[in-house]
């Protein structure tokens, strides 16, 4: 779960940066290939959706998103198998469920970004900080 969230954090950060940099026309060597014409050396796209499409059509980024989706599937399968824990593990299970809920939010930000740039950023930032908080809380039970 942790590695999937870390990969999602990296992907969602790039999504944010491409989205933002296209809107504000900020030059950045990491985002320019997606936000500017002529493979990053031309004009900025008028529509940020073109920049996001470029990112999501990038072969390397597609691989990263594919891995995150595979991780989501694996983690969901494990969580499904953890039903009805013994009483002695109830607190740990509750902490894990909280962590899983935030994990789903942060990975969804990477796999299926929605809303406006502001709402996406808010959702992502909250999920990112909550994941660390819930991960630390769950770590007590390791």
Task: Identify the residue ranges that each predicted region occupies.
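Amphipathic, heptad-repeat alpha-helical segments
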Residues: 65-87
């Amino acid at each position: 779960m942790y590695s999937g969230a870390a990969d999602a954090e990296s992907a969602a950060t790039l999504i944010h940066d491409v989205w933002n940099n296209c809107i504000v026309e900020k030059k950045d060597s990491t985002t320019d290939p997606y936000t500017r014409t002529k493979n990053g050396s031309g004009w900025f796209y008028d529509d940020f959706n073109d920049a996001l499409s470029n990112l999501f059509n990038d072969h390397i980024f597609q691989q990263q998103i594919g891995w995150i989706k595979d991780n989501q599937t694996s983690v969901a399968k494990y969580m499904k198998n953890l039903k009805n824990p013994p009483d002695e593990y109830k607190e740990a299970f509750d902490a894990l469920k909280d962590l899983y809920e935030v994990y789903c939010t942060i990975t969804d930000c990477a796999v299926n970004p929605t809303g406006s740039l502001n709402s996406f950023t808010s959702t992502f930032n909250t999920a990112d900080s909550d994941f660390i908080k819930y991960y630390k809380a769950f770590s007590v039970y390791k």
